[in-house]
Amino acid sequence: MKGKKLSLWMSGLMMMTCLGAMAQQKITGIYLTSADYIQNKMTYTETNGHLYKARLYALAPKDHILLTHGGEQTKLEKDRFFALQLKDGKIFHMKGGESYELLNRNPQLFLYRRKLPVSPKTYPEQSYRYYFSTGENNLQELTTRNIKQAFVAKKDLPERLDAAFRDNDDLMAYDTFHHMYKLEWLIK
């Protein structure tokens, strides 16, 4: 019995250590505004060969991230920056305790995806929910109806959307000829 408790306790300790290590990510930099993102202008970038580490608080979301560099820590409110880029190149926008991966650099229409928790039974399939925003406006779920409402000034857009996409799942189709999402091409 004592051996089981010790084993359980050690497993829990190792899991907490691993989760703590995963919570800190090396970042390439931070985009303070959407204009900075469009122009690829980052702050908090690598200095003297050392990257910043960001504590993202994924398990217990907070309204800030904690940047560590050279033993110094900087607390940065999530609503004070547009996005951060991880070392692996992925770029994330933080909103309301959630992380949304940015998929494009179109100033008229930003496309995002958020990974949804899945059951182990569906392995290895990844499940995502897609969103969009126009500039720095609020995120909305990516649906044809929401796109039509967001771009009311484009009078011919509703008909072009209906002709190009059968349903909401088609909205994330990628155009390999133009090297952009088809939705971006239609909104140009």
Q: Which functions belong to the PLM regions below?
A:
Residues 150-188:
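C-terminal partner/receptor-binding element of secreted or periplasmic proteins
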Residues 1-28:
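Bacterial Sec-dependent N-terminal signal peptides
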Residues 25-164:
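Aromatic-patch recognition
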